[in-house]
Amino acid sequence: MFTGFSQETSEFMMNLALNNDRPWFERHREIYERSLKKPMDELAKEVMAEMVRRFPDDPFELHISRIYRDARRLFGRGPYKEELWFSMKPSRSMEGGGTLFFGIDALSWQVGCDFWRDP
């Protein structure tokens, strides 16, 4: 059950931004798992369950971001993302359906809806 993000979450994210390397991350992996990954997974699954309950005829796809950056796109940045997010969209097609999202970083959180349609 999602109980919220903590001060430890913000502190971990801030420290990750300042120490974005594998040795630091491995030393702090337990904090990541406890204060960021687990709450994000719980929140995403609870929001998804509510969407399924409210819209039983419209299956949704849930995507939870990974902490690891794509190694092909580092461009001088560290190997870990400095934000974590999840999104969900109707699985029938992108056309006409919105994507809901939530994201968190060291200083803020974002929530919203995005609509995309071919021109």
What are these regions (language model features)?
Residues 3, 42-47, 64-67, 79-82, ...:
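A short linear-motif detector with a strong N-terminal bias
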Residues 14-67:
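Active-site acidic/histidine clusters and adjacent loop/turn architecture
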Residues 72-119:
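Aromatic- and glycine-enriched beta-alpha-beta binding-site module
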Residues 2, 53, 70-72:
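Residue-level detector of functional hotspots within protein domains
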Residues 1-7:
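Short, low-complexity N-terminal intrinsically disordered segments enriched in polar/charged residues
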